[in-house]
Amino acid sequence: VPRVPTTADVNNPKRKGYDFRLDNLLFRTATSTDRQLVIRTAEFPNQQIDLRQNPEDITTNIGQIFSRNDFSGGQGLDFAHKRNNVEKDTTRFFDSKGVDVFHGDDETSYNVHLLFTTENKDVKGTTADFSSTNNYLIKTANNNLYVSDDTTIYESTDGGDSWNAMTPSITISYAIQGMAPFGNGFFFVTGDGSTGKQLCHYTGSAWHVESLSTTFSGYFTGIWYEKDKLIVSGKSTTAEYLFEADPFDHSFSFPAAGAIITTDPDYKFTSVTDAGAVILAANENGKIYSLKDVTGSLQLQGQTRIPFEEVHSIVASEGIVFFGTKEATRDVGRFYKAELVTADNLYVLANRQLIKEWVIDSIDTTPHAMFASRDSVYCSVQEATDETYLWRYYLPTAGFARDLKLGAGGLCYGISQGSGKFVASISGKNVYKETSSYESEGYIITPNIDFFTSEIKQWVGTTVEHDEITDSRRIQCFISTREGTIDTPGSSSWELTNDSTQGFGGTEFQINRNARYLNMKIVLTPTIDFTGTPVFRSVSARALPRPQLVVIDIPVNISDQVERPNRKRIKVRNLGETVYQELKQKEGDSVTLELYDPAELIRGVVESVAYPVINHANIGSVTQYCTVRIRGVRAEDITSEFTNIIGIGTLGVVGLG
């Protein structure tokens, strides 16, 4: 009875005249000049997905294009092509440093440029740092700036450029614990950590130690001025208190029984802000309290708990509340936004959304100070022992990105502006002010790009466009095909492609990389004297599909006659029919095809088995054959991974078969 031989029956099948195997079945081909074995790449199907990122990507060039000409959506996008992408993602990127991606302060068309640096203003007149850590920074109505250091207050009347120690006519007996601007002057409170305390007032010309009648037994820990009221916090051995006071009545009383809020003494109030309908007070106990003015007095009218977190800063802008927290058990900082809503006559924060989390070993990344401008909210975050950054939330696009770099590491105790420039106080360090010199380098890192497919692509080229460069400014584009490279801006995996030192850019640089992903880092460098910045407009990358699918057409010998090398041919009745029926049974099945010459290993499916054809050659024997079509992908033989192992690679498989 004829049957189809298998690999278990035949050793070294190639030597015995077999040309290929399907799984474990062995077959002979019937190739000749008019019936060839053909291996070809399958046509790449058109994807029914619009992969253009922007309307500008409509082009006559072949391939798929990713581009960014607007980065105002902010950072944090790690993969550009995801199933749950939203419209905003077309303007987002992964990370940036030293560049302004929002362009909110200029009246020119959108572009990306370098940010200004900041400089140490040497408040104490020398290179010495502050002597304490409670370095509160405020700005009064006449644009003067003040910063505290232990019991000393320094004043700047020129927007923070120069500072002088003030000589008050009063004795500041204890360390300053908080300052609140009031007109051209300010109130401040002191405390010694026990029961010593003062409430003081500087009018802009005169100093006063306010009279305290009935007070709690403890010391002051903070002061704020909101809705024409002074909000004062204090701590005793049994509780932390929050009081209200009238700044126009110079007879102050802070009895424990008169506190608006009484909380656990292990925590303190950290920040207070006017949120419109109510005043919000943040506490390290993870609660945000809502204080409403009822017939002239503040009353607790709701509270919101942030589980397992300490709230250290809070500000409200355009009806949105922003607050910064620290995880209760780790130095992990988080930045949230929420909405103030009314529920059963109580004011609470709802729709809370985490915007950013900072996890850096051995660094307290708590957003410790906030500042609200016309279109943005800024918070400060320490990211290294010698680096603190302002992060900017841009209200028009809800984008969030790193902004100015402050020249020291530490918690920020105040952010303000002087003469149109940012001024910030770093605890235990100094005051830093924005300059008119650009950063020495800035970058934007794009998300990973894969055009919604896991297949390998042929990355053809990258293009960078910018304003004309005629001097020492420079824009470079680096690429990587490893998705994890975006986490490390200084990685050696970044490869330079575009390097623009003159002209407008716009030239596609060939990159010739085969990979699933591509990501890009665009680096901006200023003029030699740091007075000019390059103006970056857009970046794009183009890829061609790299089909891995192949189609193989094999003419299979289904004759009854068997021809073997160096052997006499024999005829086996019904052998051809048996072979043909075996092939028909494989139709539609997944198989592994191994061709012996040329050596190919393909895993796929038997797409079709054609009807038998009898070929009457002019010279030679009559051959009956059928054409088998297999569609699949090339695969590496698993044994090739072990070619260094004696008995498998050297002798057992590769050498002897």
Language-model features: where?
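Blade-level signature of beta-propeller repeat domains, shared across WD40, Kelch, NHL, RCC1
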Residues: G409-N448
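A short beta-strand element within beta-rich, extracytoplasmic domains
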Residues: T453-D471, I475, M520-L524, P534-A541, ...
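N-terminal beta-propeller domains
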Residues: P2-T167, G185-H208, G222-A259, F269-V278, ...
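Leucine-centric amphipathic alpha-helical interface motifs
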Residues: V4, V10, I39, F66, ...
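Repeated scaffold domains used in trafficking and secretory/extracellular systems
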Residues: T126-T140, T171-N184, T214-D228, T262-G276, ...
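Short Trp-Ser/Thr-centered turn/loop motifs at beta-strand boundaries
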Residues: T127, T167, S211-S213, A245, ...
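Extracellular/virion structural assembly segments
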Residues: P545-G657
